[in-house]
Amino acid sequence: MTDPAVPAAWTILELEVPAGSAEIVSDALWGLGVAAVEETPMSGGSVVLRANVSPLHDETVVELARRHGGVAKWVTVPVSVADTWRAHARATHVAGDVWLVPEWVEAPEGRTIRVEPFDVFGMGNHPTTVLALSAALDVVRDGHTVLDMGCGSGVLAVALSALTGCACECHDIAPQARDAVEHNAALNGVSDRVKWREGLDPGERAGYDVVVANILAPVLCEIADALVAVTKPGGTVVLSGLREDQTERVAAAYTGCDITDQRLDGGWASLTLCRP
């Protein structure tokens, strides 16, 4: 019998772009937090990219296609087709003995964080997630309070709490995020320390030892003042989701903060900032 709660089909993005633009467009899709990007070369010199993108990013995707001479459309496919990426999922090494592991994949030896991406979030295998987590692990300590802004599946908050004992709060505008956060927190035994919050209150000040945000660069700039405001004096802001050539612009938006660490991976970057 078919479970009525389980959809029979997914609506996924299909984006056709010139072959020369495929890599940068694919990187941009990964930056939106997708779980996978399928690339299919076409005979006319173009490439079709397919991904399960949150409807919240529809305008971003249309603009991305326009900017690179491509066309975006949404197609409906059976769940069995949309989920084929799961068969190719692998554990992702973060640092030391720490691994991020999809819930259905055999875990390697070491400290593992299990992740269920809920089909619209990443599995933790994108460089921006690895950069953010490795940088945050260097500054987060037991007893700290941490905000994961733009949390997606909650992988950063869950991992930080499980590995350090810190208390985390999570927020994301995606409607599926809360369920994903609560599922992954329970999956890793940290439901008592990882909590959902509805957003930042206007005028909110200085509540967190560490703020982590793995979001695209324009958004990091837009919310800079709010993130700094909720960080305790002497606290830390860890930023990821930006390209290497965007670091100066993003850092400049965090007025008065000093850069204490910068990491690079495949053209992506993270910044660790100290609030005065």
Regions found by a protein language model. Give the residues of each.
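SAM-dependent Rossmann-like transferase core, predominantly class I methyltransferases
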Residues: 82-142
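Conserved beta-strand segments that form the floor/walls of ligand-binding pockets within enzyme
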Residues: 12, 99, 114-116, 172, ...
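N-terminal auxiliary segments of SAM/dcSAM-dependent transferases
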Residues: 7-108
